[in-house]
């Protein structure tokens, strides 16, 4: 039974049991009452078992099914490195807090049964794990340590706080310092450590590439494509055939460019722009990947499984094989390419007054980089202008239209967080040699604005056609978090209006505009971001809070995102007149799982990308232990505060390193306060720090505060003295 059918039948049986006329009965009696054929009674048991596991239904002492009195809840346990955890329960707005003493052997990602604590009437519910229903992790990436008679493995993921005991005969010859994949054979209980066996040796921790591969393995990212898939890809032509172009709009004589980063190889969007009178005609042309990835083929199944390309600091793990992503699907200059185009007529106020979505064939004139376009439009570089003189008028129009679109978006309340992304420069050996923020400039904003309007236009079109679709949605923030934010910003003289327990995005946008350039900007921006929910993929268009729009989707990146590829199939079925009732039912049945899985794979990719960035930042700062930097306090917790440097590196100043006073954490104002000196360390405050230590295994950086009255050279000496005492 597939997931959709199981959910449907669970609802039906649960409604039946909840009916006021229901009399408790056994499974066999229920089958008779509901006229379930004998051939389908196993399916009824599957549904009843699922409802029991969910805690919605209980079995009485006489073996009869009754509605649960709410004694038990079922969910997935998320562990915290400090021992406590949270359980996510379907239907509950907030996760349930599990104190460290009440986890009862539950490990990260386990599915557990819990009871709510009697004192769980506060703002956050608390519970106790009463039963582990299923284990969520079978294998872990660890660092192996060997002793004379046994070995043990230290998990890379700090959420798994316990070491794993490895009998020597199950170590596969691993030595101390090896990165290994460990399969858990015994999860341990009553204080006994988990036990496991080494199933793969990735390499020694000091070997080049082992660090990144450990993260790849840890997140179970698929690296290689199967022979079956590669054989399928071999049969794909390197050129667009006449048959492929037949019946498409031919736009090859339109002046067309791609604008991407210098290193990009998977070019999936191209732009055309003309202006007649008061109307702009913007063409956003997206690689027609669905022409080469047939639905339900081995290649399609693998693409769905991956969900997205993963951009790690030293490599790309693509959703599609390179022959497609960098070859026939990539909109390379001078080559005929198949596209799905959204061509929009836009007035001078930024309104899309007409649009066409069509299958097209295009030929890109020039492959532009963000740097080149920036030089032309911002720096007026003579050499660049001469090199691309035939395109300069179009670039000027692009700048003009992007500003109009952005102004319209901002007017309706779209929120723009301008946090710098990190660019880590590696040498040939994979060592980080520089870390700097990505340059967000006029060229990157042009592409951003054009992709946004195309995604919005396509989503609105298909919403009103009432066809099955995958939308990109962003729910309104949690009311309690917004109220907490409102209380905090009052300390700085700012207010936000919350109407009927909801906030309009324009309120947050106005707040960000007010704090622009102020000392508290970083502080309030971060807290505002933390108050918001994650965007996700859904089959219902509930709107996008952050963009302040009712309709949004991801249409523009089918080479690297599966939802975009899925949308392209739906659009092409519709354009070709194939969207009959059978196809509608087909999409209705598969899209909920596509949306859910794609959201999960996006989060996995984001986490893996963050971890590789953290790893290389630690490696970079390892060479700078003892150096002094100025940074900004970016987070405050009871165990210390985090400081972010201008190059985006973040480290922890542990509360125990603040030796000039005893500091306590004031949660309401996000600050550390010295009890004797009344000295404050708060979010957004500038501080000088010295790099005290780094840990590549835990991927952490430790800072110590440099007092204002101490010269940098003296601070280094003081730090050396402290470190020597710690290691003596």
Report residues per predicted region:
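Intrinsically disordered, low-complexity mixed-charge segments
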Residues: 1-7, 11-14, 23-24, 707-728
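Charge-lined substrate channels and their catalytic hotspots, especially those that engage the 3′ end
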Residues: 1-283, 290-336, 374-375, 671-672, ...
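Electropositive polyanion-binding surfaces
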Residues: 32, 181, 186-188, 212-217, ...
